[in-house]
């Protein structure tokens, strides 16, 4: 009996217009069309990297509920129009661009001043309409991101966004505008119980539908590879061991390694201080109460410990460690 699962042998891409395509994949075992189609759709909508305006500064505007003399749109509508501009950045994660225009006419995305490594996919997109004597002067910050990030999330986490006049925008970074899928019947030789996956993908032009589905598949493979390799699994004993505080090896060495005078060493052993870890937990007052250990011996101990980066009165957790012999 054949136990190997079928893999799709046919992957066809049918363009349906600008940045819009239908991708057909077949054959799949029954049920795999919905399993993979739903997973790919969710990744396409949530996890694709894109670019969006995130902050705007407009000359003469303090907040988004203002109006601008000579501009037909109020600031709220102006910002909504600005969100429709599709930016694409090359070799950088963020950029600040300028838009300056005066005089009667239409302001479009093509009026934005761009560096050489930034492009606008829809330069004809209308941003505003200026009346006679109108003037628009804007600074627009564009960033790379993933998914949807509300402006209030970034506003409270970024000190720079608290500057008066700087308007923080809700940012929709996803370059994928619409995704739908359907599962149809497929046939291979005598088998008629197979699935055909048909995906309808529309992007904003930053990436093509074909590249979008490639990237989403890579993300799924990368996420599932953890389960395939069983990475990150460990026994309870290993987990407990990894969480246990690590003890500096020098603390496990006997006090004899400090090469103290015989008098000082004998005084310490008389107080059951056998290891350097035992010694550093004692305070000066505690050691001065030790019979036959005076101020001179105490100073000697402090100097020797200091040469090793240690002091008296230190706190150690889980001391003594298990298995340490006295």
UniProtKB/Swiss-Prot annotation:
Q: Does the record bear Transferase in its keywords?
A: yes
Keywords assigned by UniProt?
DNA-directed RNA polymerase, Nucleotidyltransferase, Transcription, Transferase
| InterPro entries per the UniProt record, alphabetical | DNA-dir_RNA_pol_insert, DNA-dir_RNA_pol_RpoA/D/Rpb3, DNA-dir_RpoA, RBP11-like, RNAP_asu_C, RNApol_insert_sf
Q: What is its EC number?
A: 2.7.7.6
What segment(s) does the record annotate as region Alpha C-terminal domain (alpha-CTD)?
247-326
Q: Which organism is this entry from?
A: Cupriavidus metallidurans (strain ATCC 43123 / DSM 2839 / NBRC 102507 / CH34) (Ralstonia metallidurans)
Q: How does it assemble?
A: Homodimer. The RNAP catalytic core consists of 2 alpha, 1 beta, 1 beta' and 1 omega subunit. When a sigma factor is associated with the core the holoenzyme is formed, which can initiate transcription.
Keyword check for Transmembrane? no
Task: Kindly provide the name given to this protein in its UniProt entry.
Answer: DNA-directed RNA polymerase subunit alpha
């Amino acid at each position: 009996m054949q136990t190997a699962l079928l893999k799709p042998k046919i992957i066809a891409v049918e363009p349906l217009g600008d940045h819009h395509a239908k991708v057909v994949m077949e054959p799949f075992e029954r049920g795999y069309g919905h399993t993979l189609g739903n997973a790919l759709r969710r990744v396409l909508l949530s996890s694709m990297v894109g670019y969006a305006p995130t902050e705007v500064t407009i000359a003469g505007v303090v907040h988004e509920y203002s109006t601008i003399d000579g501009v037909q749109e109020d600031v709220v509508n102006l910002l909504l129009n600005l969100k429709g501009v599709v930016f694409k950045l090359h070799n950088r994660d963020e950029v600040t661009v300028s838009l300056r225009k005066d005089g009667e006419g239409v302001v479009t995305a093509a009026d934005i001043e761009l560096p050489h490594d930034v492009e606008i996919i829809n330069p004809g997109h209308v941003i505003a309409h200026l009346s006679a004597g109108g003037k628009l002067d804007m600074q627009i910050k564009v960033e790379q991101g993933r998914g949807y990030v509300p402006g209030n999330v970034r506003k409270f986490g970024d000190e720079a966004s608290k500057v008066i006049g700087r308007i923080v925008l809700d940012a929709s970074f996803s370059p994928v505008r619409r995704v739908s899928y359907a599962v149809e019947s497929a046939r291979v030789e005598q088998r008629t119980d197979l699935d055909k996956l048909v995906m309808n993908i529309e992007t904003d032009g930053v990436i093509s539908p074909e590249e979008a589905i490639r990237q989403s598949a890579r993300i799924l493979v990368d996420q599932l590879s953890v389960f395939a390799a069983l990475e990150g699994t460990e026994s309870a004993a290993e987990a407990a061991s990894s969480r246990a505080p690590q003890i500096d090896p020098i603390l496990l060495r006997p006090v004899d390694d400090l090469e103290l005078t015989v008098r000082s060493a004998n005084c310490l052993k008389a107080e059951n201080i056998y290891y350097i870890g035992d010694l550093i937990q004692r305070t000066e007052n505690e050691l001065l109460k030790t019979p036959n250990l005076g101020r001179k011996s105490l100073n000697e101990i402090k100097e020797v410990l200091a040469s090793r980066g240690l002091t008296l009165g230190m706190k150690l957790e889980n001391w003594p460690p298990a298995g340490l012999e006295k």
